[in-house]
């Protein structure tokens, strides 16, 4: 009981002090919110507008060719495939360049899952 009472006292003090500071946090949050709308240079709306202006400027400087090339390169990524001893199905095929195929293993009757294994033959 002697060791429990200091911890209980500490818990009560933490709860009382924690609730007292909750109002201060609300006030600080409201002040920050008001400051953001007072100073338009710091507001998120101003950042979005600036971003749009920069995109227009970039497009005029580099043209649409640059944006189309980056989109094409982004979409031409090699499709991912599963490695050895990893679960596979129609949506997640095994890697053909690693010479793996999706087969029913010995535990298929229990797990009802296929796994990537080396091609036999």
Swiss-Prot record:
Q: Name one GO cellular component term.
A: extracellular region
- Source taxon at top rank: Eukaryota
Cystine pairs annotated here are 81-95, 88-102, 94-116
**The UniProt record lists the keyword Oxidoreductase:** no
List-wise, which residues carry Lysine amide?
120
Q: According to the UniProt entry, where is the signal peptide?
A: 1-20
- Major localization listed first in the record, in broad terms: secreted
Pfam families (UniProt xref):
Toxin_22
Propeptide residues per the UniProt entry: 21-80
Q: What tissues express this gene product?
A: Expressed by the venom gland.
Q: What one GO molecular function would you report for this record?
A: sodium channel inhibitor activity
Question: Where's it found, cell-wise?
Answer: Secreted
What keywords does the record list, in alphabetical order? Amidation, Cleavage on pair of basic residues, Disulfide bond, Ion channel impairing toxin, Knottin, Neurotoxin, Secreted, Signal, Toxin, Voltage-gated sodium channel impairing toxin
**What does the entry's free-text domain comment contain?**
The presence of a 'disulfide through disulfide knot' structurally defines this protein as a knottin.
Q: What family does this chain come from, according to its entry?
A: Belongs to the neurotoxin 14 (magi-1) family. 09 (magi-1) subfamily.
Q: What does this protein do?
A: Insecticidal neurotoxin. Shows competition for site 3 of insect voltage-gated sodium channels (Nav). Induces flaccid paralysis when injected into lepidopteran larvae. Is not toxic to mice when injected intracranially at 20 pmol/g.
Q: What is this protein called?
A: Mu-hexatoxin-Mg1a
């Amino acid at each position: 009981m002697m060791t429990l009472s200091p911890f209980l006292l500490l818990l009560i003090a933490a709860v009382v002090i924690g609730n007292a500071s909750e109002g201060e946090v609300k006030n600080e949050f409201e002040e920050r919110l008001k400051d953001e709308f007072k100073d338009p240079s710091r507001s998120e709306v101003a950042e979005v507008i600036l971003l749009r202006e920069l995109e227009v400027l970039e497009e005029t400087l580099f043209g649409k060719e640059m944006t189309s090339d980056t989109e094409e390169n982004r979409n031409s990524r090699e499709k991912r495939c599963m490695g050895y001893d990893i679960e596979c199905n129609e949506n997640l095929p095994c890697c053909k360049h690693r010479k793996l195929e999706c087969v029913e293993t010995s535990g298929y009757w229990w797990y009802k899952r296929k796994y990537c294994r080396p091609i036999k033959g």
